[in-house]
Amino acid sequence: SAASDVYKRQVDELVGRTDLLKELPEAKEYHLDLSAILNNPYVDKKHPICYNKKNEYNFELEKTLDEKVLLTKLKTALDKKQKRSISIDVGNTDRSFGTIFGSEITKKYYNTLEDDTFTVQCTGAGGQSFGAFIPNGLTLELVGDSNDYFGKGLSGGKLIVYPPKGIRFKAEENIIVGNVALYGATSGQAYINGVAGERFCVRNSGATAVVEGVGDHGCEYMTGGKVLIIGKTGKNFAAGMSGGVAYVLDEDNDLYLSLNKEMVSSEPVVSKYDVMEIKDMITAHVAYTNSEKGKEILNDFSKYLPKFKKIIPHDYKKMLKKISEMEGKGLSAEQAQIEAFYEIKRG
């Protein structure tokens, strides 16, 4: 194909442009006749069949809820750095809700805002990429559910999702966010009162998340951050996980069946730090979502604690141990990390 040699800004600009295709010599060797595709008499370079220049880069951003509602209602608060909370209904066609407003926050204040400076209470079904890339200072609270890529690239913001009051099902047994939630998250918090789909927290490098169950390939390629799962995991959990920590409630003692052990180890929770970490994360989860499962665990914590497993990458565990040793010698946290890295590298 010659298409790769032609500068185009959108795939749409290539639609109908068979004049940009050329036949490779090998095609004739395999007796392939591509003339019906390449010799299209209806192709007109000036007026392509499907591509319409009028639609070029028209993403109709003015129709998004960010432009129509968030930037309108929160403009004064944004300009004056005032705390503000608003409510809004969302639908599953509202993609990347919060992202444009989040970009305006970042432009003005970078990551200097306090948590919950702007709180948006949403009701309904969140579209794809709900809360993607939202920064420090922005909290999105969703009563309902959300599609795939929930919290994609989370960058310091806070996401809370829980089902409406009066539901007749158990939240911890039902999916509330779709696949690939928190993909590539770098910082921030997410509290999910229900089950997430497949590939939860893939490439998470610094966010903290609490969820009540995940599908297959959870925490895949994770490099940092903390994840607490107070429910079941799907198969191939922690595949390629090289950093961060996952705490999993293994009530049926069968996590080993779904855990990918190539790069991680599973161990009981014994250190005081880990115990407090789990308790604090569940406490926050209950405070934000009113999770019944979370309350059940807190009310009988001594019973549930032995059922938790700590999933930690082998090399990450070595690094943490070495950093602790260096700090014990009086080095600062930053110096300890550097020295630990080089000492492990030297072997």
How does the language model describe each region?
Residues 19-33:
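Short glycine/threonine-rich loop-to-helix capping motif typified by GTGT followed
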Residues 15-18, 36-347:
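Long, distal/terminal scaffolding or interaction modules
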Residues 2-7:
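Short, small-residue-biased leader/transition segments that mark boundaries at the very start
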Residues 10:
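Conserved, mostly hydrophobic/aromatic
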